[in-house]
Every structure is written in C-alpha cells, then in structure tokens.
C-alpha cells in the first residue's frame, strides 16, 4: 500500500508540472492572440478602401479589363495556396485547414499545384503525394508584408506565364478564440463580383431605392468626380496587384490569429483536464492513505489481542 501512495504522489507531481507548462502556454497564446486580433482589425479598413477604389474604376469604365481578370482556359492546372501553422499544440486547427483544402481539391489532385505556407501543410500534402511546388516556412507570429508580397508576386508570375489557370486560397478565417472557420476562395482570375460592396452597403442601397432614388445613378454621379492618371487601366493594374498582396496579407494575419486562438483554447482544455486529473489522483491518494492507516490500526489491535 505504501508503494501505491508513493506512485500516486509521483503521478500528482508529474501532472502538476504539466499543468504549469500548459497554463504558461495558454497565457502566452492569449497575449499573442490579442495583438494578432488587433492587427486583423487594423488591416480591414485599408483593404476595404482598396476594394472600393477598384469597384469605382470597374463601375465607371465598363469595358476595362486586365490580365489578372482574364480566364486562362480550363486545360491549365490550378494553383492552391494553403496557410496553416509551423507548429502543433493548437488543437485541430492545422488538420482542419488541410482537410478543407484536400476536400476542395477532390479528384483534381494531379492537376493542382500547391503553395504551402507553414510546415504542417507542406508535410501533410507531401506525405500524400500532392504536387507541392513551393513552400514558405517559419512564418513570424506577427507577419510583415514581405512574405505575402513574395507569394503574390510568384503566383501572379505563374498566372501571367500560363503555368496555372486559376488560383485558390485556403486559410482559417478568424471569428473568435473558440471558432476558426477554414474557408477556400478563388483569388485568380479576379472578377468584378469580388469587389461588390458588402451586404451592409447593399442594404443601404435598398433603403435608398425605396426612397425613389436610383443607386446606380447615385454611384455614377459619385464616380464622375474621379479622374485617373495616366489612365484608368494603369491605375487598375496597380490596384489589382496591391489588392492581391493585401488579400494574402489579411489571410496570413487571420491564420495567425486563428492559430493563437486555437492554441489558447487547446492549452486551456489541457490545463482543465490536468486539474481534474489531480483531483482524482488526490482522492485516490487519500483513499489509499486511509486504507494504509486502517490496516496499521488493525495490525496494532490484533497484536494487542494476541498478547493478552
């Protein structure tokens, strides 16, 4: 029985050490999450203003086009950018993103070129014999604009050269610390629909229409105050390229926020489980100790009875 109590005490000590580690990791992830979440919020106005500028150009110059908006045909392979973490200990975050991308690719495995962002994505798809053509690893917790710019320039070049005919992006859209939703979006070729105003603006347009005002005419009057130098096409080209980089930057920021949220949640669950285990082990220890004491008392009483 004494051996049993020693073993239980050893297990309690081991679990308690693990709990201290998971608690520390939870606190670190929470601190990183707050900063990552703030960066996501700070980036949204910039991307929204750029989207509005592109929409104004496309709405004003009805016939304008750009190579990034032109289809390359159905026979070319597709490019697929997949973003996840370099490290684990973040619950199901990595595997959920990878499975979402694999599900989207489906039976087009042979005709899909994968751009892996993060070690988990690279390893996951290489082990399954997917065509991983490039990889971007060791992404910082607070990414700079350099990585998305490198990825965007490489992808745009492949698209322009006809190496790939379309490009998809899979990443975990950050909603809150508990929820990270894997999404897949087509980012090349771009379409005018991608730059339409969000639902809030559409609802406002509906209200305007109910007031007997034509939103199309209103938008047209608003667009007339804009003049583009040297031309609308040149401005559009620069904006589309910048928007591509901004899209990847936002996706990377959301991926990092999702990673930290998932890690914080996973470490909190691990800490809670450790506390539950310590309670159970402590109860077992007390029962074992009580049993040992009872046994000793019985032995003393038996010895006293035998001595009479």
UniProtKB/Swiss-Prot annotation:
<dbReference type="Pfam" id="PF00231">
    <property type="entry name" value="ATP-synt"/>
</dbReference>
<keyword id="KW-1003">Cell membrane</keyword>
<comment type="similarity">
    <text>Belongs to the ATPase gamma chain family.</text>
</comment>
<dbReference type="InterPro" id="IPR023632">
    <property type="entry name" value="ATP_synth_F1_gsu_CS"/>
</dbReference>
<keyword id="KW-0375">Hydrogen ion transport</keyword>
<dbReference type="InterPro" id="IPR035968">
    <property type="entry name" value="ATP_synth_F1_ATPase_gsu"/>
</dbReference>
<keyword id="KW-0139">CF(1)</keyword>
<dbReference type="GO" id="GO:0042777">
    <property type="term" value="P:proton motive force-driven plasma membrane ATP synthesis"/>
</dbReference>
<dbReference type="InterPro" id="IPR000131">
    <property type="entry name" value="ATP_synth_F1_gsu"/>
</dbReference>
<dbReference type="GO" id="GO:0045259">
    <property type="term" value="C:proton-transporting ATP synthase complex"/>
</dbReference>
<keyword id="KW-0066">ATP synthesis</keyword>
<dbReference type="GO" id="GO:0046933">
    <property type="term" value="F:proton-transporting ATP synthase activity, rotational mechanism"/>
</dbReference>
<dbReference type="GO" id="GO:0005524">
    <property type="term" value="F:ATP binding"/>
</dbReference>
<keyword id="KW-0813">Transport</keyword>
<comment type="subunit">
    <text>F-type ATPases have 2 components, CF(1) - the catalytic core - and CF(0) - the membrane proton channel. CF(1) has five subunits: alpha(3), beta(3), gamma(1), delta(1), epsilon(1). CF(0) has three main subunits: a, b and c.</text>
</comment>
<protein>
    <recommendedName>
        <fullName>ATP synthase gamma chain</fullName>
    </recommendedName>
</protein>
<dbReference type="GO" id="GO:0005886">
    <property type="term" value="C:plasma membrane"/>
</dbReference>
<comment type="function">
    <text>Produces ATP from ADP in the presence of a proton gradient across the membrane. The gamma chain is believed to be important in regulating ATPase activity and the flow of protons through the CF(0) complex.</text>
</comment>
<keyword id="KW-0472">Membrane</keyword>
<keyword id="KW-0406">Ion transport</keyword>
């Amino acid at each position: 029985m004494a051996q049993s109590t020693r073993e239980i005490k050893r297990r309690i000590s081991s679990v308690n050490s693990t709990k201290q580690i998971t608690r520390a990791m939870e606190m670190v992830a929470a601190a990183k999450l707050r900063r990552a979440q703030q960066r996501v919020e700070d980036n949204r106005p910039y991307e929204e203003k750029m989207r509005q500028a592109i929409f104004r150009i496309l709405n004003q110059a009805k016939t304008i086009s750009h190579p990034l908006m032109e289809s390359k045909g159905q026979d070319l392979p597709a490019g697929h950018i997949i973003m996840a973490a370099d490290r684990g200990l973040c619950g199901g975050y990595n595997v959920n993103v990878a499975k979402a991308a694999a599900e989207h690719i489906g039976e087009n495995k042979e005709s899909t070129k994968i751009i892996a962002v993060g070690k988990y994505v690279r390893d996951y798809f290489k082990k399954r014999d997917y065509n991983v053509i490039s990889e971007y690893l060791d992404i910082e917790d607070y990414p700079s604009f350099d990585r998305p710019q490198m990825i965007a320039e490489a992808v745009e070049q492949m698209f322009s050269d006809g190496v790939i005919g379309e490009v998809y992006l899979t990443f975990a859209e950050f909603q809150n610390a508990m929820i990270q939703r894997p999404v897949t979006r087509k980012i090349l070729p771009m379409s005018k629909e991608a730059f339409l105003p969000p639902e809030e603006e559409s609802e406002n347009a509906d209200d305007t229409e109910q007031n007997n005002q034509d939103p199309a005419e209103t938008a047209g009057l608003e667009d007339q105050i804009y003049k583009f130098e040297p031309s609308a096409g040149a401005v559009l080209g620069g904006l589309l390229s910048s928007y591509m980089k901004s899209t990847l930057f936002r996706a990377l920021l959301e991926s990092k926020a999702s990673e930290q949220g998932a890690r914080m949640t996973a470490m909190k669950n691990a800490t809670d489980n450790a506390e539950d285990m310590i309670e159970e082990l402590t109860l077992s220890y007390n029962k074992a100790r009580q049993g040992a004491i009872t046994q000793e008392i019985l032995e003393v009483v038996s010895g006293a009875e035998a001595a009479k």
